[in-house]
Amino acid sequence: MKKLIIASICVALGVVLSTTSIPVGPARIFPFQHMINVILAVIVGPRFSVGAACSTSCLRNVLALGSPLAFPGSMIGAWLSAYLYKKYNAIWAAALGEIIGTGLIGALVSYPIANFLLGKPLALLTLITSFSMSSVAGACIGFVVLQILSRRHLLHKEA
């Protein structure tokens, strides 16, 4: 029940923060879902982390705050983040899982979806770049948050 409550709070936080972007050169990145994926991977594990990513993507799409590309990216990133954290028991592994899962694998899976939705071919490198910029920034923020919580002995990790 505790994990469900934590995941639910993070879903609400993810929906609210999805309206916030950070300008990086000519682009705008949206790193907060990635931050939440890393934090949930460590705190609640893979099932609740992926469930929260899916729930956040659903709500963002229903509220017109996101795109269908959010599903594969966030869910793959959440799963790989939690998987690598469980395997290596290290916060850096969770951050790396989010970057690889969303930035690379999520972008590759989203490529045919993006082409279908746009009705014209899109450069794969464009998706990888945009997904990677957001996931690297979010994974770094999540890593820092988890390090601070850990150093203050406030982090209760998934067993």
Language model features with spans:
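Loop-helix junctions at membrane interfaces
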Residues: 1-159
